[in-house]
């Protein structure tokens, strides 16, 4: 289930982003970025619609996914065809 980031309290959104970064050990390229820099990059992707906050009922967990990849996977799981 996609969670609209606009409906989250600012502190909640910040905590989700930080949790995902710390859990995933996200790689941002050759130069290592600070936690704050990583958070700002991920928040920008969320606000620009590039990334989605997703709740998994199966795993009872929250994650942040690339929008295109998430929608492809959802379509694949539902056996639908993308236009």
UniProtKB/Swiss-Prot annotation:
Classification via InterPro entries: UPF0270, YehU-like_sf
Pfam families linked: UPF0270
Stored SUPFAM superfamilies: YehU-like (SSF118001)
TM regions (residue ranges): none
Family as reported in the entry's similarity comment: Belongs to the UPF0270 family.
Annotated protein name in UniProt: UPF0270 protein HI_0956
Organism listed in the record: Haemophilus influenzae (strain ATCC 51907 / DSM 11121 / KW20 / Rd)
């Amino acid at each position: 289930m996609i969670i609209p980031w606009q409906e989250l309290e600012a502190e909640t959104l910040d905590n989700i982003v930080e949790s995902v970064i710390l859990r995933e050990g996200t790689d941002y390229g050759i130069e290592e970025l600070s936690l704050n820099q990583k958070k700002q990059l991920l928040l920008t992707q969320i606000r620009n619609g590039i990334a989605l906050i997703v709740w998994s009922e199966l795993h009872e967990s929250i994650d942040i996914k690339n929008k295109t990849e998430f929608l492809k996977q959802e379509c694949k799981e539902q056996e639908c065809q993308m236009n």
